[in-house]
Amino acid sequence: DCMIALTSPRVQALLSQHNISLDSMLCKNVPEEVSVGVVNGKVTLSSASQTAAGQVLVVNGKLMITPDAAEVLQKYACILVNGMIYCPQCLSAVVSARCILNGKLAVYPDDAVLLPGSSIKLDNTFLLRAQSRLYWNEHRFLAVDSRLDTAALAAKGCSFSAPKAILCASLAP
């Protein structure tokens, strides 16, 4: 029993000559001399990432993909992820075609600043470092501090993207 079995045509021929039962969630054919990289935790793929063509990448955790990573993604023979993939909208089709995912795919706007965490609190401390950017969180933004200077936040040109936003009544338009 195994989660993932990497085989080659030669290995499959050898297995078929014997009474062997392979119980796996996924059986993937790869070239005979393929290099396999395993990451337990978090890895980021960007244009600066170095990889040999035809490599297999196994990620147990989080795979963060930046909008400039298209060429790097094409170099991998296969990417297997047990966990989470964070992917920009512009690469979602490539990621769907090149990656095998046992978990969740979170697609974010290409130009967004990713803010990690289960929720992002918008307060005057956030306002101090805010820029004219689109901020994204996979869960929610919280604007529940009635002292938040929403006019100053709007003047900075901030915008937000998340499935949910929770606002206190005094901040609602």
Predicted segments with their positions:
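N-terminal, charged amphipathic alpha-helical interaction modules
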Residues: 142, 160, 165-166
